[in-house]
Regions:
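Single conserved hydrophobic/aromatic residue that forms the stacking wall/gate
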Residues: 1-12
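Cell-envelope/glycan interface and biosynthesis
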Residues: 16-232
Length: 232
């Protein structure tokens, strides 16, 4: 007799809570999101192409996953003037609106990176692996098929006025305002245990204004939002 996914979650919740020592709410989130498993172990295959799609070390997009309505970001909104930077149309439109709003406040917010195909991510992963080794990539880079960039809803942002985004005025503005345009600060330092990715100051994810406002107000990672509001 095979257990359903929900039955499995209920069966291991108490055991996992005892072993790890998390409170019940944190344990439920971790178990529901398969964070009780090792990264890349028995990952869930994802076909969702909406703005709330979850891609991480436990949710696998696969080689064939290509977002709908991929759109190029106009050169003037990219750090290198590159017209090959893409995202879903909905995310690109929101990013442009946000960049224009920042510009009105005298800031120079730009997109550094957007959509990456499975092959692009595979090349990125292998490059970092050869340069820095396995311990580095485990913390900072995900394997091909598990990257948010493949969804077309994630962007890395940059400042046109500073080489270090985290030290820029644009970064401070993003922290305070990105949710208004449907973006969440994806890899917070305080959520590393949940996201399983080290803090990335530049990486923001489009989820829509409704979800972004809730995530900002309740201080939720996308994983926590997904467990609380999407996968009930």
């Amino acid at each position: 007799h095979l257990l359903s996914r929900r039955q499995r979650q209920m069966c291991i919740r108490d055991r996992y809570m005892d072993e790890v020592g998390d409170d019940e709410e944190t344990t439920v989130i971790k178990v529901n999101l398969d964070l009780d498993k090792s990264p890349y172990q028995d990952a869930i295959k994802v076909t969702d192409k909406t703005k709330l799609v979850l891609a991480n070390k436990h949710h696998y997009l696969g080689k064939e996953y290509i977002p709908n309505n991929l759109t190029s970001i106009p050169q003037k909104y990219t750090i290198d003037g590159d017209d090959n930077t893409k995202g879903t149309k909905e995310a690109v439109d929101a990013a442009i609106k946000m960049i224009e709003a920042a510009k009105k406040e005298g800031l120079n917010l730009l997109v550094n990176s957007g959509y990456r195909s499975y092959t692009d991510q595979e090349e990125t992963y292998n490059t970092y692996l050869s340069l820095y080794g396995e311990s580095y990539v485990e913390r900072f880079v995900v394997k091909a098929g598990y990257s948010e960039h493949q969804t077309g809803y994630a962007f890395d942002f940059a400042s046109g006025n500073s080489n270090i985004f985290q030290n820029s005025q644009e970064y401070q503005w993003m922290i305070k305002n990105s949710y208004k345009y449907g973006f969440c600060y994806r890899f917070l330092r305080s959520k590393e245990e949940i996201t399983e990715i080290r803090h990335e100051a530049w990486h923001f994810r489009y989820v829509g204004t409704k979800a972004a406002k809730i995530m900002d107000k309740e201080e939720l990672s996308l994983e926590e939002y997904y467990a609380k509001y999407v996968e009930k």
